[in-house]
Amino acid sequence: MASLKDVARLAGVSMMTVSRVMHNAESVRPATRDRVLQAIQTLNYVPDLSARKMRAQGRKPSTLAVLAQDTATTPFSVDILLAIEQTASEFGWNSFLINIFSEDDAARAARQLLAHRPDGIIYTTMGLRHITLPESLYGENIVLANCVADDPALPSYIPDDYTAQYESTQHLLAAGYRQPLCFWLPESALATGYRRQGFEQAWRDAGRDLAEVKQFHMATGDDHYTDLASLLNAHFKSGKPDFDVLICGNDRAAFVAYQVLLAKGVRIPQDVAVMGFDNLVGVGHLFLPPLTTIQLPHDIIGREAALHIIEGREGGRVTRIPCPLLIRCST
């Protein structure tokens, strides 16, 4: 990583002049300022804000930095952040968070984060995603939480969506359900492939024919949850459902399904069973009857990612965290 001295050398000025430019001192000549700014850009120099804190405090506590892509600004994965903060505090580490507001914003957020010279970095996302890691973060002490990247050297902690859907399908088969209607998440969602593969493998392993399964993918975007109502209505013949269990891509889809089924006088689970996925915080038990669903282990993902940094774990690999099946009253 480039230093203040490197910038001064490339610009042909003193370190004091570089410092004055960075603090927007008016006494620096425009031509000199331009050379310094060009050198900063060429070297991708990031000022060491932690050094200022060290000089002020006399010591440097261990610090864990979190890059949050939609994790802090939506309610669906906030347990990841809470677990990271709690784990860091438990082991005497400081932690701070910087939001990433879009894919294009990641480089800016990374520069801002590196200015604080953290001892470790956790990159988090809302929903399992494939990310492109900003170049400035390569070589840093970093771990991924709820996301993966191309580089196999990057350790990551993600939900075991495949096994979760496999085991939940076994539960449905054991309960006697044979006519599933599946509303999966959009095909573009990384978790969708794992979940559908898990379902289909369990179905085949039970000696069943996939041709008897009705499978659909939701469109991308929250606006399309209402589309599920018309899709569901299309599977009623003479007022009767042509399926005996509805497998939903998440609990929000299950919520829409409940409204349609109950409005038609369909009893859950006596006439049709419903299975969700996510165990959306504070919602599962509010379904009537309570929804059988699968827990996304966001709290464990956050804790394991933090411990990876704190304990100095070595090796880059994908660690899949089990997703427990929560059997309630809808199956």
Swiss-Prot record:
Keyword Repressor among record annotations: yes
HTH lacI-type domain span: 1-56
PROSITE patterns: HTH_LACI_1, HTH_LACI_2
Keyword match Zinc: no
GO molecular function: DNA-binding transcription factor activity; transcription cis-regulatory region binding
Superkingdom: Bacteria
InterPro entries for this protein: HTH_LacI, Lambda_DNA-bd_dom_sf, Peripla_BP/Lac1_sug-bd_dom, Peripla_BP_I
DNA-binding region as annotated in the record: 4-23
Keyword terms: DNA-binding, Repressor, Transcription, Transcription regulation
SUPFAM superfamilies membership: lambda repressor-like DNA-binding domains (SSF47413), Periplasmic binding protein-like I (SSF53822)
Task performed by this protein: Repressor for the csc operon. Binds D-fructose as an inducer.
Protein name: Sucrose operon repressor
